[in-house]
């Protein structure tokens, strides 16, 4: 949150006379009570003569393309002559008699903009009438000239101090659980704790903010408001101001606080609502009362209902969105943004101020659903104090009458009660037990009361009732946190615990790490697949309706509307990564990912037990049963070349064989042996897909992806992939170390003629088994077909490497092992040895 230093120090200075600290100390104060600052910066400096002026005459110059005004401005004796200053200006939002801010020749404005006397538009211009953006108070959107009440200063007096140009803006990082701190009220409360100051709550005593509330005693209701239970809304209030001057502008002091907090001044009524929000943390909305017809109903929208918000976007609503409606239709998207139909305009004379307390989750979902984050929604989704609806309405009404005239109606609509805060029981010694620091009972009680809690003491037990603005305090651990942070986290000693003996990675963790290392060593780059996916990808793949991968688990509050289920396969995310990389000009790469997937399992409905104590075993069992099945999968994908052309020879494309080899690398790292079999499984090519088996049970697939699926998805042709259920592999606790031999190896080849239908992998496995203990490796290096071999016949040539661990092998021993392998192949497949 952006907030000016002078605002918070001014609020604190009301009860702590003379208190003032440097910006660096204020920054440290925020940090001391647990609030980081993203940074702080002074308002850019203006040097040279910057004075108040009074516009005496305005000459309209109409002979130019845009309207130009030649002004004579009274700047007193600041120009050295006492004569009126001649200034040419293009702004239109000031008139004769207005008090303005003038930079005279010799002044240098922010951005090194030097002011000098020069002729422009045929007139001499000796100075500039300044806007807020030119003085560094706002961005270029706030380009209007600053017009002031004459009480700010006489013509010729220095304007810096009166305008508050010697100030510093802080950007305070407010965490989601501390919504109360998105206001001057919340931040000054924290700073009072940081500097041991007296805090006066502006919601109780508005005088600390310079506001004297003047509203008539409440007599009756304004209009009827129906707050339907389905909306989960807590409170709703209305107050009316009638007969305001629609041309009135908010005063500079208010505009200044708004601009330094990142808000854009709009009109008097809107500026008042934004100021009250920044002061108290209560978002408000101003309706043009003339455009509101009949009673108001706060209800859930009908699916498909249309509504145009203040940002001129026509939105299609969801049945979970909460709306405020009158007889004419929807007037506001509750807690997020108002509508155009009842917007404050330059003809508005009667205003309804609305302040409410909305359900945090409902507002958060609506904001995310419509991609519409506003200052109001940021506060409502973090929690707003339900007890300040009345004072917010009264302050807003008071300020608007002061600014724009009119009267506050005696009627007030208020629906809903302030919810009772639930007391929390805590041992007074609990903070000391958790922090390892001795906190006295007096310290614990004082810190909790400083937060705003009511504390009842019974022996060594405290019954703590949180204040209405601290909805985040729900259990004793929250109270402990408050004591620790206010006493100073730096007071807690850093003690490294002694590691228990015999602990380390589990066997499953070791396997996961080994698999990751093996694939990285094989040249694959690791990515982190998304745990969410779009289920429509399975329609593109053409999966059957009963395919296991369609048993997805829906996400109630998805980050993206399209990716609304938990992934049952890593391939959709892996292929998205391929598509992104190819779009960026990377065409040759191979990736791998290790991630859990989730399959629907059990009841699917999780109970919501209290976190105050350990739930019963039956509840734990119900929780476990409701969880989805979450096996660990590993996947690889490759496209383009795996070897590049160069002086060493031609390059080689990544093929389905490489995808299968990646599965073998996983198996070796896991200490198991995979069996291969031909398979027809989507999204793979039916003729270039291998099933990965353990004891005859499929645990995954590898191969080239189906060309039609690749085309539909916009992926490169011949992209290959592998996915394997790592959790389905038997866990080998202690992988056997490889046997190393210092004796030389013998190499022999064998070629076997078999039927075309027999897989080469099956023949390879039989050759390895038949060769006995002396065989070290069996590798297929050639497949040959010809008329001489016969129809539906093929020749498979294998390279055999033999080695003994205790001696040098003879050719006779290797030949005998080779012949034994051929005999077993003949027995199993009727294979004939060639050559």
UniProtKB/Swiss-Prot annotation:
Cofactor comment: Binds 2 magnesium ions per tetramer.
One Pfam family matching this protein: B3_4
tRNA-binding domain: residues covered: 44-160
EC number: 6.1.1.20
Known partners and oligomeric status: Tetramer of two alpha and two beta subunits.
Family of this protein: Belongs to the phenylalanyl-tRNA synthetase beta subunit family. Type 1 subfamily.
Protein known as: Phenylalanine--tRNA ligase beta subunit
Taxonomic source organism: Corynebacterium glutamicum (strain ATCC 13032 / DSM 20300 / JCM 1318 / BCRC 11384 / CCUG 27702 / LMG 3730 / NBRC 12168 / NCIMB 10025 / NRRL B-2784 / 534)
């Amino acid at each position: 949150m952006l907030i000016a230093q002078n605002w918070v120090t001014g609020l604190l200075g009301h009860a702590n006379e003379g208190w003032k600290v440097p910006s660096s100390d204020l920054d440290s104060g925020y940090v001391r009570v647990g609030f980081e600052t993203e940074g702080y910066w002074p308002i850019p400096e203006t040097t040279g003569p910057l004075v108040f002026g009074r516009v005496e005459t305005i000459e309209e110059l109409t002979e130019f393309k845009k309207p130009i005004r030649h002004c004579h401005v009274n700047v007193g004796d600041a120009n050295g002559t006492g004569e009126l200053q001649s200034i040419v200006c293009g702004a239109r939002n000031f008139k004769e008699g207005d008090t303005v801010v003038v930079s005279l020749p010799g002044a240098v404005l922010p951005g090194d903009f030097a002011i000098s006397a020069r002729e422009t538009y045929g007139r001499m211009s000796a100075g500039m009438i300044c806007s807020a953006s030119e003085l560094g108070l706002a961005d270029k959107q706030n380009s209007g000239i600053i017009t002031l009440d004459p009480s700010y200063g006489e013509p010729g007096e220095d304007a810096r101090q009166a305008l508050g140009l010697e100030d510093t803006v802080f950007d305070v990082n407010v965490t989601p659980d501390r919504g109360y701190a998105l206001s001057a009220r919340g931040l000054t409360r924290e700073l009072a704790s940081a500097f041991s100051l007296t805090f006066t709550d502006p919601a109780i005593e508005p005088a600390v903010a310079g506001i004297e509330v003047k509203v008539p005693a409440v007599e009756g209701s304004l209009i009827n408001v129906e707050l339907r239970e389905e909306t989960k809304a807590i409170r709703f209030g209305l107050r009316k101001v009638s007969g305001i001057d629609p041309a009135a502008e908010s005063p500079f002091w208010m505009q200044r606080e708004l601009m330094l907090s990142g808000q854009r001044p709009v009109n008097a009524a809107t500026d008042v609502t934004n100021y009250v929000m920044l002061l108290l943390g209560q978002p408000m909305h101003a309706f043009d009362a003339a455009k509101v017809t009949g009673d108001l109903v706060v209800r859930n929208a009908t699916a498909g209902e249309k509504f145009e918000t203040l940002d001129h976007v026509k939105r299609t609503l969801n049945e979970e969105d909460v709306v405020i409606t009158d007889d004419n239709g929807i007037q506001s998207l509750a807690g997020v943004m108002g509508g155009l139909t009842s917007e404050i305009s330059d003809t508005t004379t009667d205003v309804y101020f609305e302040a409410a307390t909305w359900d945090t989750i409902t507002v958060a979902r609506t904001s995310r659903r419509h991609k519409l984050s506003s200052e109001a929604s940021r506060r409502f989704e973090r929690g707003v104090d339900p007890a300040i609806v009345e004072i917010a309405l009264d302050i807003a009404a008071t300020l608007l009458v002061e600014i724009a005239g009119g009267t506050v109606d005696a009627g007030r609509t208020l629906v809903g009660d302030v919810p009772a805060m639930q007391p929390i029981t805590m041992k007074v010694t609990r903070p000391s037990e958790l922090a390892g620091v001795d906190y006295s009972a007096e310290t614990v009680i004082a810190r909790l009361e400083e937060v705003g809690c009511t504390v009842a003491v019974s022996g060594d037990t405290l019954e703590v009732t949180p204040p209405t603005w601290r909805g985040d305090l729900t259990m004793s651990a929250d109270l402990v946190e408050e004591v620790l942070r206010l006493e100073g986290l730096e007071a807690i000693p850093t003690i490294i615990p002694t590691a228990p003996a015999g602990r380390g990675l589990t066997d499953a963790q070791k396997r996961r790490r080994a698999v990751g290392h093996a694939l990285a060593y094989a040249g694959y780059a690791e990515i982190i697949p998304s745990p969410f996916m779009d289920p429509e990808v399975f329609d593109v793949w053409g999966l059957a309706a009963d395919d296991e991968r369609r048993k997805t688990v829906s996400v109630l509050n998805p980050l993206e509307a399209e990716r609304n289920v938990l992934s049952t396969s890593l391939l959709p995310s892996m292929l998205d990564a391929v598509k992104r990389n190819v779009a960026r000009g990377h065409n040759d790469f191979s990736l791998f990912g290790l991630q859990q997937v989730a399959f629907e399992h059990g009841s699917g409905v999780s109970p919501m037990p209290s976190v105050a104590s350990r739930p019963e075993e039956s509840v734990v069992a119900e929780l476990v049963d409701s969880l989805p099945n979450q096996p660990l999968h590993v996947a690889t994908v490759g496209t383009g070349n795996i070897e590049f052309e160069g002086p060493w020879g031609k390059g080689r494309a990544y093929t389905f064989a490489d995808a299968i080899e990646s599965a073998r690398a996983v198996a070796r790292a896991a200490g198991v042996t995979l069996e291969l079999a031909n398979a027809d499984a989507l999204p793979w090519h039916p003729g270039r897909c291998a099933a990965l088996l353990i004891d005859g049970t499929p645990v995954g697939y590898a191969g080239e992806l189906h060309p039609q699926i690749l085309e539909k998805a916009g992926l490169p042709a011949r992209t290959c992939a592998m996915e394997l259920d790592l959790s389905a592999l038997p866990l080998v606790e202690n992988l056997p170390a490889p046997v190393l031999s210092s004796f030389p190896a013998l190499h022999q080849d064998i070629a076997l003629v078999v039927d075309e239908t027999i897989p080469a992998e099956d023949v390879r496995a039989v050759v390895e088994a038949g060769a006995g203990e002396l065989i070290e490796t069996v590798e297929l290096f050639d497949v040959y077909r010809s008329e001489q071999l016969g129809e539906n016949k093929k020749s498979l040539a294998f390279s055999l490497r033999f080695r003994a661990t205790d001696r040098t092998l003879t050719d006779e021993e290797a030949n005998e092992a080779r012949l034994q392998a051929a005999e077993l192949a003949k027995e199993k497949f009727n294979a004939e040895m060639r050559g």
